[in-house]
UniProtKB/Swiss-Prot annotation:
Protein task: The RuvA-RuvB-RuvC complex processes Holliday junction (HJ) DNA during genetic recombination and DNA repair, while the RuvA-RuvB complex plays an important role in the rescue of blocked DNA replication forks via replication fork reversal (RFR). RuvA specifically binds to HJ cruciform DNA, conferring on it an open structure. The RuvB hexamer acts as an ATP-dependent pump, pulling dsDNA into and through the RuvAB complex. RuvB forms 2 homohexamers on either side of HJ DNA bound by 1 or 2 RuvA tetramers; 4 subunits per hexamer contact DNA at a time.
Similarity comment text for this entry: Belongs to the RuvB family.
Domain of life: Bacteria
Protein name: Holliday junction branch migration complex subunit RuvB
Gene assigned in the entry: ruvB
Length: 350
């Protein structure tokens, strides 16, 4: 939890901030959705098949890093199916009655979206299993000797779950999703399309070079791209510059301390501390957390994922190590590796 709070303070966090509205930039159909080509095409097939049969689509699980479009795709699925959409999140469903209230208010073939589904209470999961498999809800009414079991028939529905940590899902829950789909980081060219589209929707004049400058610093994440685009728009408006070109975008993002690889001050502090204090590693995560005055969860869940994905650090059995990419990015020369000296077999050295 602490890691999520820390990450939410970062401009380049892929997580949605409380009160942040990005609906204006969201695509409204699969045709408008950029990137995730195989996932998008497969979803189109499943949607068409469900509509042709007049049935609820099979349950869908989206998993992958935050900010890649899981919520947007869930809404698009409902829109393309021509059915209602109801959204909630795992932590908001506290007791079985909360889930029952949601499920009993669904119309036939509606889409129920549960974000952060890995954070569902295990007791809630037990109630969800028969609802997903048989469209039935088994509840215990009352307490003690007066308690009785009640079975409620539910309309057929499609559950769309989203998680950033699929490894935390229980096997029984994961196995009940007939359509598991992974979302991956976006290519720069895909983000250029997203940024260009976003600038049009925001009424912002942006050159192709300006769009690429924003895209390449967006950490492969559309949500980050949209956030950076808005901040660049602010700087350009105050400076009275239009259209926004690469020079203005670069100046604005430098002011925001987001460098050319999408790294921010926290990322650079992590890399610099490893280089300056520990010679590039290997160093344990607990030692790093203490050196950075951060919690271990923050280091593992907030700082490291993107650095590992981009090849700046690697995990080894002995700890974290900087790669050649990291040393180059820091403008430093890695220390020469000193191979361990083995004593001569016939020498008197211990």
């Amino acid at each position: 939890m602490a890691g999520h709070e820390e990450e939410d303070e970062r401009l380049i966090s892929g997580r949605r901030r409380e009160g942040e509205v990005d609906a204006a930039l969201r695509p409204q159909s699969l045709a408008d959705f950029v990137g995730q080509r195989q996932t998008r095409e497969n979803l189109g097939v499943f949607v068409q098949a469900a509509r042709a049969r007049g049935e609820a689509m099979d349950h869908v699980l989206f998993h992958g890093p935050p900010g890649l479009g899981k919520t947007t795709l869930a809404q698009i699925v409902a829109r393309e199916l021509g059915v209602g959409f109801r959204g909630t999140s795992g932590p908001m469903i506290v007791k079985a009655g909360d889930l029952a209230a949601i499920l009993t208010n669904l119309e036939p073939r509606d889409v129920l979206f549960i974000d952060e589904i890995h954070r569902l209470n295990p007791a809630i999961e037990e109630v969800l299993y028969p609802a997903m498999e048989d469209f039935q809800l088994d509840l215990i009414i009352g307490e003690g000797p007066a308690a009785r079991s009640v079975r409620i028939d539910l309309p057929p529905f499609t559950l769309v779950g989203a998680t950033t940590r699929s490894g935390l899902l229980t096997t029984p829950l994961r196995d009940r999703f007939g359509i598991p789909l992974r979302l991956d980081f976006y290519e720069t060219d895909e983000l250029v399309q997203i940024v260009t589209r976003g600038s049009r929707l925001l009424g912002m004049a942006l050159t192709d070079e300006g769009a690429r400058e924003v895209a390449r610093r967006s950490r492969g994440t559309p949500r980050v791209a949209g956030r950076l685009l808005r901040r660049v728009r602010d700087f350009a408006a105050v400076a009275g510059r239009s259209p926004v070109d690469a020079f203005i975008a670069d100046a604005a993002l430098n002011r925001l301390e987001v460098d050319g690889r999408g790294l921010d001050a926290m990322d650079r502090r992590y890399l610099s501390r490893m280089a300056d204090h520990y010679g590039g590693g290997p160093v344990g995560v607990d030692t790093l957390a203490a050196a950075l005055a951060e919690e271990r969860d923050t280091v593992e869940d907030v700082i490291e994922p993107y650095l590992i994905q981009q090849g700046f650090i690697k995990r080894t059995p002995r700890g974290r190590m900087l790669t050649a990419i990291a040393w180059t990015h820091l403008g430093l020369t890695p220390p020469a590796e000193t191979p361990p000296v083995q004593p001569d077999l016939w020498s008197d050295a211990p």
